[in-house]
Curated annotation (Swiss-Prot):
Entry protein name: Glutamate 5-kinase
A Pfam family the protein falls into: AA_kinase
EC id: 2.7.2.11
Family: Belongs to the glutamate 5-kinase family.
GO biological process, alphabetically ordered: L-proline biosynthetic process
Keywords tagged on the record: Amino-acid biosynthesis, ATP-binding, Cytoplasm, Kinase, Nucleotide-binding, Proline biosynthesis, Transferase
Length: 375
């Protein structure tokens, strides 16, 4: 047992994400026996003093079963209908199963809109923290019924990581039908080796994760690695493991070397910067010259208009924008001090020239370093 695994086992607040394949009867609705098994393991974690937030897939699969559909639909309105029907069964199942262990569950449905708005983000954080303080197990899912393509998280791995940021959890456990991350595709290479530990933000790991998509789920190993990187921003460890392993949650809590453990390698971001980093949808893009790129990456300074060569998109003051280098690679994300039109007028100019161009000066920086997060 490594020291890191021991620390993992001592973590108090856990986010547990369980994929569709582990909750359904091969697409034929919910597997109530499987749900009962997960509830029993979670109840034991709670009895040991740990707090648990459950991010559960399965609503669409259950809805498909109730509606008699055998193939996952592609049309958004059909997915939303299936989610609405299936959510009823999912909530009823969790409420009943957790009651057997003397536990209360709460349904929490979120969209990216809820987390991109600062006030709603803080409200969601307060609600989740209150539920945990009351000993309740929040069961979180994306609000598929109202989410549009523009405001979707895209997968529950991403949602789980953002909920981890929201609640300042120490551990994110992503349970899947795979044993973890391998150095080669195990389906094609019999000698593929499991990656036991790594750094959550190591770009080399992404090269090992070819995107995969099943009929019921939306994400593959690549989405799980991106989720781990997001979770690391608040200092959380991510453990990707097979939900087919017996007593998997208890064994993780005991510090057993199971699955792939991805560790944070930087200090946690401040709460406000976690919120900025968690924005999945940027309103615009600022293309930087090589000098500005270097200053941001190496010194983490504020972004001045003189270092911007192009402005893409339409945005307002206070919106989230992405900063990219001359080759289009993301450098940072931040809250911009000027609208897109204003930014186009002052780009390539020094800060002391802003008033002469616009007739006023809101801020000398396009993005202040306190509102800037390096990617």
């Amino acid at each position: 047992m490594t020291q890191t695994r021991q620390q993992l086992g001592k973590a108090r607040r856990w986010i547990i994400k369980i994929g569709s394949a582990l909750l359904t009867n091969e697409g034929r609705g919910l597997d109530h026996e499987a749900l009962a098994g997960w509830a029993e393991q979670i109840a034991r974690l709670r009895a040991s003093g740990r707090e648990v937030v459950l991010v559960s897939s399965g609503a669409v699969a259950e809805g498909m079963s109730r509606l008699g559909w055998t193939t996952r639909p592609h049309a958004l309105h059909e997915l939303q209908a299936a989610a609405a029907v299936g959510q009823m069964g999912l909530v009823q199942a969790y409420e009943s199963i957790f009651q057997r262990h003397g536990l209360r569950a709460a349904q929490v449905l979120l969209t990216h809109d809820d987390l991109s708005n600062r006030r709603r983000y803080l409200n969601a954080r307060s609600t989740l923290r209150t539920l945990l303080a009351l000993g309740v197990i929040p069961v979180v899912n994306e609000n598929d019924t109202v989410a549009t393509d523009e405001i979707r998280f895209g997968d529950n791995d991403t949602l789980a990581a953002l909920v981890g940021n929201l609640t300042e959890a120490q551990v994110l456990v992503i349970l899947t039908d795979q044993k973890g991350l391998f150095d080669r595709d195990p389906r094609a290479h019999a000698d593929a080796q499991l990656v036991s530990e790594g750094l959550a933000m190591d770009p080399e790991l992404l090269k090992l994760a070819a995107p995969t998509f099943g009929q019921l789920g939306r994400g593959g190993m690549a989405t799980k690695l991106h989720a781990a990187a997001r979770a690391a921003r608040s200092g959380a460890y991510t453990l990707i493991a097979s939900g087919r392993e017996p007593r998997v949650l208890e064994r993780i809590a005991e510090g057993e070397q199971i699955g792939t453990l991805l560790c944070p390698d930087k200090e946690p971001l401040a709460a406000r910067k976690q919120w900025i980093a968690g924005q999945l949808i940027a309103k615009g893009e600022l293309i930087l010259d090589t000098g500005a790129t270097k200053v941001l990456r190496e010194a983490g300074r504020s972004l001045l208009p003189v270092g911007v060569t192009h402005v893409k998109g339409e945005f307002s003051r206070g919106d989230v924008v992405t900063c990219v280098d001359p080759d289009g690679r993301p450098v940072a994300r931040g809250l911009v001090n000027y609208s897109a039109d204003e930014a186009r007028r002052i780009m390539k100019h020094r800060a002391d020239e802003i008033e002469g161009i616009l007739g006023y000066v809101d801020e000398p920086e396009l993005i202040h370093r306190d509102n800037l997060v390096l990617l």
